[in-house]
Swiss-Prot record:
Keywords: cGMP, Cytoplasm, Nucleus. This is Probable cGMP 3',5'-cyclic phosphodiesterase subunit delta. It comes from Drosophila grimshawi. One of its GO terms (cellular component) is nucleus. InterPro entries: Ig_E-set, PDED_dom, PDED_dom_sf, Rhodop-sen_GMP-Pdiesterase_dsu.
Length: 151
């Protein structure tokens, strides 16, 4: 199978990788979690161990550093937070055009749910997954699942 036989999504996926992710307190800029791992691999469930204090923050700034071989016209992601498989929250982020053969850093701010909707860490621990679908326009590039553990 030559490269001409690959779908657009498959071509982008082959040359796409996450280099690292950083979560910061959006108010102070202080790093609360960092992982130098490619969370974009679709065939396994990833794990992240994040400090429990993240649940008390008003907002979190997420920084994703990624590399791509293929250009993307409208890079975006859909992110679902699931508790025991049921959707609790869903967010949509759009970055836009990404050039070929580039490494990019994308920062987004995620605001916490109202305190009345928050559950304790001991209930959430190991029961929350974040499902992130990466797209170029409507073409799915990859889908990542990360299970959260609070430490």
């Amino acid at each position: 199978m030559g490269s001409d036989d690959l779908s657009t999504g498959d071509k982008i996926q082959k040359g796409f990788q996450i280099n690292y992710m950083i979560l910061r307190d959006a108010d102070t800029g202080k790093v609360i979690w960092q992982e130098n791992k490619d969370f974009s691999a679709p065939d396994l469930e990833h794990e992240a161990r994040v400090p429990v204090k993240i649940l008390d923050m008003r907002a979190v700034s997420r920084e994703i550093n990624f590399s791509t071989i293929e250009a993307m016209e409208n890079f975006r992601l859909d992110q679902k937070v699931l508790f025991k498989g049921r959707i609790m929250e869903e967010w949509f982020f759009e970055m836009g055009f990404v050039g070929a053969n580039t490494t990019n850093t994308w920062q987004s701010t995620i605001e916490a749910a109202p305190e009345s909707q928050m559950m304790p860490a001991k209930v959430l621990n190991g029961n929350v997954t974040i499902q992130t679908s990466f797209y170029d326009n409507e073409t799915l590039i990859t889908k990542s699942v990360v299970r959260l553990y609070y430490i």
